[in-house]
Amino acid sequence: MAHDTAFLGASTVLGQYWTKRRYFDYLINKDNFQLTFGRSFRMMVYLDNAVANGQENMRRDIEADTRATNYLINHLADIKPEFTVFVTTCDMLAENADETTQPLAGSDDPYVQNRINLYRELNRQYGRVLNVHLPEIASPTNRGFSKLIDTLLCPPEKGKLDIAPLEMHQLYFAQRILGDVEKCIPLGIPSIIPAMPPLTTTEITEAIAPQLLDRLPAFSPEQPMGSRRTSIHSFQWLDPRDGYLVTREDQLELLKFYFAPDLL
C-alpha cells in the first residue's frame, strides 16, 4: 500500500492556497512533473489546466491549452494513485446540470473538448476518483479566471462593457476549495458541483462596482444566459436543500468582502 501524497498544480492559485494548509509529500508543477512517473500514491490532487491557470487564460490560448492537456493525458498511465481528487470545471456539463447529469460526449469548442478529454481519460484509467466541477472561479488577485470579475476590477476607460447584463454567474471563491473537498471525501461520492447561488451580471456589478452600472450594455436575446447548475449534495452544507452551498445573501456579502470591502 502506498503512503505518499502528491499535489499536481502546487504552484498555482488554488495549489498554493491548498498546500499551505495541508501537507503533501510531492508538490508538483510543470517543471518537476516527471517526479511522479513510476510512483504510487495513496492520494493525489490533480488540477485541470483551466483550473490551474484560469479559464479565460486558456480560452485565449487554445493551442497551449491543447498541448498541456494532451501531455497530461499521455502521462496518466505513468502515475499510480489509489485515490484521486480531480479538480476541473463545469464547462463539460449542461448549464442547468447537477451531479446526475452526464458530461457532454463532445464539443465543437476546443476549450470544452480539452476538458472532456482529460476528464474522460482520467476517470477511465484511475479507480477511485472524486471529480470536483468548479463553476466560474473568482480571484481578487489573479486575472484570467473570470471575464466578469476582470472587467469590473479593470474596466476599459470608456464605452459600454463587454458583458451581458442578465447573464447568470455562479462565482466560486478559491478560499472555499479545501473545506468543500474535505467535506466530500468521507461521503464517497464520485462527483460534486460546489454550486453557488446564481447572480446576474447586473446584481454583481451593483454589489462590487456600482459606479459601472451605467456602462452595462442593453439586454439582447443573443447574449448568453449563463450558469444555473445545482448540487444534489447541497444539504450537506445548507438546509433547506435548494441546490446551493450558501444563501444568496451570504454570496453577495462574500462578493463585497473579497472584491469591495469598502462597500461593506
Question: Model-predicted segments: where are they?
Answer:
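Conserved glycine-rich Rossmann-like NAD(P)H-binding loop of the short-chain dehydrogenase/reductase
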Residues: 23-34
